[in-house]
Regions:
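Short, surface-exposed coil-to-beta transition loops
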Residues: 74-75
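Active-site recognition of the HExxH zinc-binding catalytic motif
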Residues: 78-91
Length: 137
């Protein structure tokens, strides 16, 4: 699994720990949406320093940079949830939405706020409608 924007790291103990941080955030979503598809995760280094994450639209694949994993838990959650929306629903950036803006600047969303915006995109997407049927809360 490769993308032009991020150079994948080879798997080792350190990369495994970084990947686990991302997977644990995906599990937060999975607790709300039990039918969330399996999302493939890679960790790497951005070829453009401003990139924190990349997703294949509607293809359930995300790449997260080491730089993003080194950020605070809330900042990493914002990046991961943003990429989940891309990967699962295919939605593009929305500069009016704090979760789906193209840049991570200004106000960071907390866990509840991230989930609120993520739910909005999943529940409003017809191809992800099956997920909303399994939503808890």
């Amino acid at each position: 699994m490769k993308t032009k924007q991020i150079k994948n790291f080879k798997m080792n103990d350190e990369v495994y720990k970084l990947r686990t941080k991302v997977i644990n955030l995906i599990r937060e979503v999975k607790k709300q949406y039990r039918t969330l598809p399996r999302i493939e995760v890679r960790i790497g280094e951005a070829r453009n320093h401003s990139v924190l994450g990349v997703a294949r639209l509607k293809d359930n694949k995300i790449w997260i940079t080491k730089r993003a994993t080194d950020m605070s838990q809330d900042a990493l959650r914002n990046v991961v949830f943003h990429e989940i929306v891309h990967a699962v629903t295919g939605f593009e950036h929305d500069e009016k939405c704090p979760l789906m803006k193209s840049t991570l600047d200004g106000y960071l969303l907390n866990k509840n706020e991230c989930m609120k915006y993520l739910k909005k995109y999943i529940n409003n997407n017809t191809s992800a409608a099956i997920l909303s049927l399994q939503s808890i809360g």
